[in-house]
Regions:
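Residue(s) in the substrate-gating loop at a strand-loop-helix junction
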Residues: 146
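Short C-terminal tail/terminal secondary-structure segment
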Residues: 2-3, 151, 205, 227, ...
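Active-site helix of classical SDR
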Residues: 126, 162, 170
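Substrate-binding pocket helix/loop in short-chain dehydrogenase/reductase
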Residues: 102-103, 110-115, 197, 207
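Short, small/polar-rich loop/turn modules that mediate ligand/substrate recognition or access, typified
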Residues: 138, 178, 183, 237-239
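Conserved glycine-rich cofactor-binding loop
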Residues: 11, 18-20
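Alpha-helical segment proximal to the catalytic Tyr-Lys
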Residues: 131, 175-176, 235
Length: 252
């Protein structure tokens, strides 16, 4: 890993960091010199693999298993971060669920499941980390949104609504936390090359559909934007939804 050290001395919590975009974000922030709390809901093996990758490159990392919808588990995660590393400077709310269901067939429990993770999870994480973020003097919160919040998407009313709410949450927090020196931004991925279940392969025409670049993004593309927003070059950037989707927002 190339380490330019712009995040040296900082501590980052990344939720949903065991795979895909979350994993890429954890690795990118570690490349910048940050110590990483790698959160996963239940898959310890995946989280430990990310920690090993960080440590093998000379970084520092900690596994913290816990469901972001569980306020007590999130409090324990924040406490573990401070106990191990002494501080929290960066929080990346990446944990999310991928679900599809026609709205007319959707149960309230299915609706609630998405809200619990995406919105309540972000709420719990910011609340738990806020005292440490304030002490940082230059704290950063990054929420990972989704292009569907702007375009809508069939059979994903719950996901679309939650991601749209996350953008509103970002803008509200940017106001609320500015006096504490905390920036709050949302990164909005589009078509990103992450593995799908074998029984639900991605249709070929979806691979670049809507992008104006004609290519599909990688988790590392999202991670690079997150890393920038966590660094000194983004000190004057807050309350923004940064689209990382090959211009799909323009072509939608």
């Amino acid at each position: 890993m190339t380490n330019t050290n712009e995040l040296t001395g900082k501590v980052a919590i990344v939720t949903g960091a065991g795979r895909n975009i979350g994993r890429a974000i954890a690795l990118a922030l570690a490349q910048g010199g940050a110590s990483i709390v790698v959160n996963a809901r239940s898959n310890r093996a995946e989280a430990e693999a990310v920690v090993r990758e960080i440590e093998s490159a000379g970084g520092k990392a900690l596994v913290q298993i816990g469901h972001v919808a569980d306020a007590a588990a999130v409090e324990a995660m924040a406490d573990a971060a401070v106990k191990r590393f002494g501080r929290i400077d960066i929080l990346v709310n990446n944990a999310a669920l991928r679900r599809e269901k026609p709205f007319g067939q959707m149960s309230h429990a299915e609706w609630r499941e998405i809200m619990d993770v995406t919105l309540d999870g972000a709420f719990h994480c910011v609340q738990a980390c806020l005292p440490a973020l304030k002490k940082s003097g230059a704290g950063t919160v990054i929420n990972i949104g989704g292009l569907s919040a702007h375009t809508g998407a069939k059979n994903r009313a719950h996901v679309v609504t939650a991601k749209a709410g996350l953008i509103g949450f970002t803008r509200a927090l940017a106001h609320d936390l500015a006096d504490d020196g905390i920036t709050v931004n949302c990164v909005v991925p589009g078509l990103i090359g992450t593995p799908r279940p074998k029984d639900k392969p991605e249709p070929a025409h979806h691979l670049t559909h809507g992008t104006i670049t004609g290519e599909r993004g990688k988790p590392e593309d999202v991670a690079a934007s997150v890393r920038f927003l966590c660094g000194p070059g983004a000190r004057y950037v807050t309350g923004q939804a940064i689209h990382v989707n090959g211009g799909a927002y323009l072509g939608a």
